[in-house]
A protein has these predicted regions:
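Acidic, polar-rich low-complexity tracts and alpha-helical solenoid repeat scaffolds
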Residues: 1-249
């Protein structure tokens, strides 16, 4: 780029701003990066750093933008751009966060950054948008925990399913999947007991009945009630028969 080779920082900066205002993000970023070292330690340093990071953000290069914005907020904590920078930093992780079927590490990072922003800037114009995003990302974590547990259930690994489902409830007690998770715990416990060797069935049916009573108490009007009632009756019948056999010995 001839302009960058000109050695005229004011001209380069002026052209970078022109591209920036015209939303030509790639061209603006190239010039901001090329002129940055000229203004190191000057009052213009934070502006150039912010504009360049925003160019990356607008170009949807969220990985690079997040790195630049993190550097910016650490270095220029008192800048006039700090609120915007921290908002964009949080949003980078939001846009990098994948759907619930994939690893949710980025979602966790997004939630941390978003909650930090809301705590720091409770009166921000962006606060309502961030609240909405916070709800969406939290739901994504609930979905992930549910899907992980359901996968074990679906492939017939009922012991693992029970553990995973209980962990999902423990981790996210307010989950929108709570009813379905508690139902699956009952169902998986019933199947696990039914498929167990005789000497372990009694304890496992008793554990299943505990899960059943918890489910019925919390969701007495559930669409699954008839089904879990049937399972519970089968478990009780087994326990009664077993008790009679023990008494006859």
């Amino acid at each position: 780029n001839a302009l960058l080779k000109s050695g005229q920082p004011e001209l380069i900066y002026s052209k970078a701003l022109e591209y920036y205002q015209k939303e030509k993000w790639s061209r603006a970023s190239t010039l901001f990066e090329g002129v940055q070292h000229y203004y190191s330690g000057t009052p213009r340093e934070d502006s150039i750093s912010f504009f360049n990071a925003r160019c990356k953000y607008k170009n949807r290069d969220y990985d690079t933008a997040a790195t630049l914005l993190d550097d910016f907020r650490r270095k220029f904590g008192r800048s006039a751009f700090i609120e915007d920078a921290e908002g964009m930093y949080a949003l980078c992780f939001y846009y990098l966060s994948p759907g619930p079927s994939r690893d949710q590490t980025m979602t966790g990072q997004a939630l941390i950054a978003i909650n930090e922003f809301m705590s720091r800037y409770p009166h921000s114009e962006q606060i309502e948008n961030f609240k909405t995003i916070n709800t969406e990302l939290t739901q994504r974590l609930h979905d992930k925990a549910y899907l992980n547990a359901y996968t074990y259930y679906k492939i017939g690994r009922y012991k693992s399913a029970i553990v995973s489902l209980k962990n999902a409830l423990k981790q996210y007690p307010e989950s929108s999947h709570r009813e379905e998770i508690m139902y699956l715990i009952v169902d998986a416990s019933y199947r696990f007991a039914s498929n167990s060797v005789a000497e372990k069935q009694t304890d496992r049916y008793l554990a299943m009945l505990d899960s059943y009573l918890s489910f019925k108490e919390e969701f007495p009007e559930s669409k699954h009630i008839k089904e879990v009632d049937r399972m519970a009756q089968h478990a009780r019948d087994y326990l009664d028969r077993n008790k009679q056999e023990d008494n006859n010995i």
